[in-house]
């Protein structure tokens, strides 16, 4: 109700020009400041709101490219990123003319720091770290990766679109069980970070925060043009028109919940995720790769089991019970994003998982579906 009422009040406002709608400028500034404080940003940290995680990533890549060209004269810029990094970084490289240097992950599914060190060089514009990475839900070694970026004067962006509104509260609630190594703007060498309020911040789609360590770094994100007949045109992201609706709704939700509210939601979420992981690992033939501590995890076949479960068959059996889990791979897996909304149904899900495993074994092996984790092709 809080989000809906705020959205109704800002149904027609446009954040393209915050001089015309000053309340949207104040909303953006307050959300960026609140998030910067949460993510240990220095006093000079600054940011903008975007429409979501992908746009935040696109803007971070563009800013890194512009800085590398302006300050170091880089003409053939590269992004160094792990194979686990979000596909939006490859989309950004495609759109903005950067090359990608993809490095492997280690046995624990985090970025291989030695491989990052080998890949970083004079053409590096950006090193990407994830907190957590999406496929297996583990946090990259951000401090080491940021140090390597800083050694060549490159940006280091932390993709915390999934974790920005979870990891800080997880550490507060139980640092031993749910804590992470340093990963945010408190890490030297991290130049930008993104966190989606419309994911585990529980705001409506779509609003994300993209923060830079300083206003000086943020300016590389902004496009300014006045050599036409319409006056000065300046935009901080890829959109022109920006709906005020999601911005206002996000502001209302953050103000309503506050840190205490988010702590309660995160505790409930992570207790539920722990139950799910334990339930999956208790099934002979299934595995949870890596050591995810938070709200993301993948279900894969256990290669050491006498009778591994066929994951595509398991996915179809769960779908028949009205549980939609994104398919991913390699390796073949089913992806889960746990939120506070899953708390009331975790017992039902675990019971259905047991039944679905039996059905999958009876059905036998089927080939992976030829579709994406999240894709719209028509």
Report residues per predicted region.
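Short Gly/Ser/Thr- and Asp/Glu-enriched loop/turn motifs at secondary-structure junctions
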Residues: 43-44, 290-296, 329-334
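Cytochrome P450 catalytic-domain "roof"
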Residues: 35-43, 360
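Short glycine/serine- and small hydrophobic-enriched flexible loop segments
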Residues: 37, 62-66, 251-256
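Glycine- and Gly-Pro-enriched alpha-helical subdomains that act as flexible
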Residues: 66, 72, 274, 298-299
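Conserved PLP-enzyme active-site core in the AAT-like
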Residues: 44, 51-224, 228-232
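Non-catalytic terminal extensions of PLP-dependent enzymes
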Residues: 1-25, 29, 33, 263-266, ...
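Active-site C-terminal subdomain of aminotransferase-like
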Residues: 172, 176-294, 300-305, 377-378
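Active-site nucleophile and cofactor-binding loops and adjacent substrate-binding regions
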Residues: 23-24, 48-54, 81-83, 290, ...
């Amino acid at each position: 109700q809080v989000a809906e009422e705020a959205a109704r009040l800002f149904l027609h406002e446009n954040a393209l020009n915050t001089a015309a709608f000053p309340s949207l400028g104040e909303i953006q500034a307050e959300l960026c400041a609140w998030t910067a404080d949460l993510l240990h940003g220095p006093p000079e940290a600054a940011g903008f709101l975007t429409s979501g995680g992908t746009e935040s990533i696109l803007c971070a890549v563009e800013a890194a490219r512009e800085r590398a060209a302006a300050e170091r004269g880089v003409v053939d810029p590269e992004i160094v990123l792990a194979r686990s990094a979000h596909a939006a970084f490859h989309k950004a490289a495609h759109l903005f003319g950067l090359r990608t240097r993809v490095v492997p992950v280690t046995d624990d599914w985090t970025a291989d720091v030695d491989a990052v060190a080998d890949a970083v060089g004079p053409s590096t514009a950006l090193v990407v770290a994830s907190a957590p990475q999406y496929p297996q839900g583990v946090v990259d070694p951000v401090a080491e990766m940021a140090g390597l970026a800083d050694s060549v004067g490159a940006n280091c962006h932390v993709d915390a679109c999934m974790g920005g509104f979870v990891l800080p509260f997880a550490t507060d609630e139980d640092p031993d069980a749910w804590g992470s190594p340093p990963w945010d703007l408190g890490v030297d060498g991290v130049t930008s970070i993104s966190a989606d309020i419309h994911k585990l911040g529980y705001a409506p789609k779509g609003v994300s925060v993209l923060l830079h360590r300083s206003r000086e770094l943020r300016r590389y994100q902004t496009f300014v043009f006045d050599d036409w007949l319409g006056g000065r045109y300046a935009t901080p992201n890829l959109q022109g028109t920006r709906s005020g609706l999601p911005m206002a709704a996000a502001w209302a939700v953050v103000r309503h919940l506050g840190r205490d509210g988010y702590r309660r939601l995160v505790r409930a979420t992570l207790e539920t995720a722990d139950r799910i992981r334990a339930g999956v690992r208790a099934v002979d033939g299934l595995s949870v790769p890596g050591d995810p501590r938070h709200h993301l995890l993948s279900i894969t076949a256990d290669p050491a089991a006498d009778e591994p479960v066929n994951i595509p068959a398991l996915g179809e059996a769960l779908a028949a019970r009205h549980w939609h889990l994104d398919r991913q791979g390699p390796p073949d897996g089913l992806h889960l994003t746990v939120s506070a909304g899953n708390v009331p149904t975790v017992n039902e899900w675990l019971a259905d998982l047991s039944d679905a495993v039996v059905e999958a074994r009876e059905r036998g092996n089927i080939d992976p579906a030829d579709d994406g984790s999240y894709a719209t092709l028509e």
